[in-house]
């Protein structure tokens, strides 16, 4: 009997070993003892081969980061002037945020909203008290937060405002950027985001950003069916476009007058980026809904949130909206630490003062190169340089960013003639100065050579006319 048992065990161990399974099914990969690729060039080649081509990155590979400093695999140091589109306001790998992550990851990472966990309720209370709203609906990405706000506005419109079934309208702004999901790009004027992705979703109207008169005209004509007005207090992807003074107050008054929800997308502009906790604070207005994201996760984990009062939020019932990972304990712990850093390190004040320093430096450069620089604009550390397309062509803003990269500064273009400058709010004055000096050297030393080299090339075509509304957005 014992011999039979041993033979059976031997057969099972062989039959169901890794080698046995491989012989039977032929599906398991062979062990690879080689080290993973480490050179920047090879890593970029691998990404190009195996990843979808939905981004056009500046060719630099991040290997390590701390504060405002990035290192590539070869050890070259760079100053970060993008901060992951403002997701790293607190600085890369902030020790307090990393500690919160490490402590929580050893206890509990996910419960789903099918059950309670011991972190999200504390985070929910903290966030709502901090921003003065009754309730929060947690999600993960900024686009999810916007989608959540849109659904909530439609639901409120049908149930509270008595908009007829399936007739709720959301008004948004030309030049807006709220994400790339289907409902969101249905509002977009970005032809790259809309062409080939139809049919786009109905129920959207557009208005010029910063034009309160045009907004009131739409409200007068269709206000009985308009549920919400979605806007960025400062348009980021459009090139850090700041509305005229008084615009946000006028929007608040119009939304109240016509019973329309005022929905502020503060995913990029919020959490101290503009020199205020929220960009809406520049005009001391309170939207009906605020969407937060990016820096809410401290550059560590995706966290987004929609804030609203109960008379809006409670129109969502169980089963009508949710997310498996939204409000997870790991994200909640990280988000609370991220908020602590903003408050304790006075990042609102740092953003305001350092932003003033940066714009002084950039305007000095503008005076030296008026032929090339059309405008310097921004609030806090949310800034952009717009170049003169005629004098820059056929060189593009992307080419400027490539030259900046060679000089140790990482920035990203938006559209063909704008470079956005949004460093971590923890950046030092010396690093700001280094970044400005690098830009000066690019314009003085590199740009003349770039113009000479590219003199015979056809300028990069950048269509600025929206397919849908016909507006010339970035001319």
From Swiss-Prot:
Residue ranges, annotated region (Disordered): 23-43
PROSITE patterns xref list: AA_TRANSFER_CLASS_3
Class of this enzyme: transferase
Cofactor(s) recorded in Swiss-Prot or TrEMBL: pyridoxal 5'-phosphate
Compartment(s) of residence: Mitochondrion matrix
Catalytic activity entry: a 2-oxocarboxylate + L-ornithine = L-glutamate 5-semialdehyde + an L-alpha-amino acid
GO CC term (a single one): plastid
Reported function: Mediates degradation of arginine for nitrogen recycling. Plays a role in non-host disease resistance by regulating pyrroline-5-carboxylate metabolism-induced hypersensitive response.
Protein name, per record: Ornithine aminotransferase, mitochondrial
Organism: Arabidopsis thaliana (Mouse-ear cress)
Lineage: Eukaryota, Viridiplantae, Streptophyta, Embryophyta, Tracheophyta
Gene: DELTA-OAT
